[in-house]
Amino acid sequence: MSESPKKVIVGMSGGVDSSVSAWLLQQQGYQVEGLFMKNWEEDDGEEYCTAAADLADAQAVCDKLGIELHTVNFAAEYWDNVFELFLEEYKAGRTPNPDILCNKEIKFKAFLEFAAEDLGADYIATGHYVRRADVNGKSRLLRGLDGNKDQSYFLYTLGHEQIAQSLFPVGELEKPQVRKIAEDLGLVTAKKKDSTGICFIGERKFRDFLGRYLPAQPGKIITVDGDEIGEHQGLMYHTLGQRKGLGIGGTKDGSEDPWYVVDKDVENNVLIVAQGHEHPRLMSVGLIAQQLHWVDREPFTGTLRCTVKTRYRQTDIPCTINALNDDRIEVIFDEPVAAVTPGQSAVFYSGEVCLGGGIIEQRLPLTV
């Protein structure tokens, strides 16, 4: 008597990646079911329509593939474990990454537990562009095959046990191949554009959205030389290295180089700017990271040579990591790096393997 197929619950977002993931798993002989997660309670018509359209697309794909679609509401968990923390970070003048938090708290915690306990799943699957490899009994997280789409940066908080319970079918493919499969199958999501914007909250005017929850606190814009040259509407709307949306032109000395945010003085509510994207004040020689997560869940001690990304899609930066204590490390770059931003994540790699990462607590500025 042959063993019954393993049951996989695919997180169906209404997008092309999760749609094709479900089909690929069917081809591999798994018993596949879908789950649509509602993680945000919409409070205006436009948002409601987008969420309803995503659910309709997910349902249409499941109908086409002949699989059941479950739905679950994680809005309370999202608010408590992702959104409130996201607002706290912004209030403190830092720039958080909600997608990383959402993966940690919702997709690979609430969803994983619900799929296993309520739906009897052996595995969950998502449309993330990452791969897993099992080495010496431990699952490792690898970059996705498509370098342009690799999403390991967003999944560094996962431990080997979570990865062992997760499948990432499109991680072995390039995006154009995924779209081609969807087109060949006649899936409604084949030409749907990729979602951007805050995880689950969708595409909307970020400034308007943040303004609903955090009161704007206007303050001065000051140059690195101490000249006041404008007013900002709130430090939370600005991030290091930002060029657009400052509302300031050239200066009295006639230099037309664009202005960049090089620092935030949170205590005095001052935005500090300089001209030129390689201004020394924008450069860092390293960083201190905290809230560390290592995929192998082994504590890090000593020193390590590896590469780091301080933001998504950045080219890997060779670096040396030194352990400061159990939950803090110092990272020294081989070459200075622009716009290292507290609140964002530093994620470490050894070749194709994502080792883990942490939150940037402070940058180590280039002193000239």
Swiss-Prot record:
Catalytic activity: S-sulfanyl-L-cysteinyl-[protein] + uridine(34) in tRNA + AH2 + ATP = 2-thiouridine(34) in tRNA + L-cysteinyl-[protein] + A + AMP + diphosphate + H(+)
Positions of disulphide bridges: C102-C199
Residues under site feature: Interaction with tRNA: H128, Q344
Chain positions recorded as ATP binding sites: G11, M12, S13, G14, G15, V16, D17, S18, M37, G127
GO molecular function, one term: ATP binding
One of the record's GO cellular component terms: cytoplasm
Active site annotation, chain numbering: C102 (nucleophile), C199 (cysteine persulfide intermediate)
Highest taxon in the source lineage: Bacteria
Region Interaction with tRNA: start-end pairs: 149-151, 311-312
Chain positions covered by the region annotation Interaction with target base in tRNA: 97-99
Keywords recorded for this protein, A-Z: ATP-binding, Cytoplasm, Disulfide bond, Nucleotide-binding, RNA-binding, Transferase, tRNA processing, tRNA-binding
Stated family: Belongs to the MnmA/TRMU family.
HAMAP family attached to this UniProt entry: tRNA_thiouridyl_MnmA
Record-given protein name: tRNA-specific 2-thiouridylase MnmA
Lineage, broadest ranks: Bacteria, Pseudomonadati, Pseudomonadota, Gammaproteobacteria, Enterobacterales
Primary gene name: mnmA
